[in-house]
Amino acid sequence: HYVIIESVFTQKRLAKERRSKIQLYYDIITAIVEDTQNNDSVSPTRIQFKCNTSYDKLTKYLEEMKERQILEKEKVIKITEKGMKFHSDYAKINELILDVSRDIKAT
């Protein structure tokens, strides 16, 4: 019985953990990449739903990413070459971290 209660608290704690800014940048670019298979742009509202974040937070991060030249934003949002490089590099780093985590758990 105690283990079940502990598990519920653990799940709630994990659910409340916030994404880092860099993770949210990656999630935003991933949402754009997934949504632009046939187009080269996507609306902010679509990104908001795919990233499961508030519109205010998304708008703030989109502006930061535009200032850092990761995205181009006019009426629609486009990923720059720098943004695609960031997405690719982050995916590689994330995969490396997951591999190391699996190795540690296996030992």
Regions found by a protein language model. Give the residues of each.
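Short alpha-helical segments that sit at the start of domains
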Residues: 2-29
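Short acidic, hydrophobic short linear motifs in intrinsically disordered regions
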Residues: 38-50
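Short amphipathic alpha-helical interaction segments
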Residues: 52-66
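A short, conserved structural fragment
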Residues: 66-77
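Accessory beta->alpha helical hairpin/"wing" motif in late/C-terminal subdomains of nucleic-acid enzymes
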Residues: 76-86
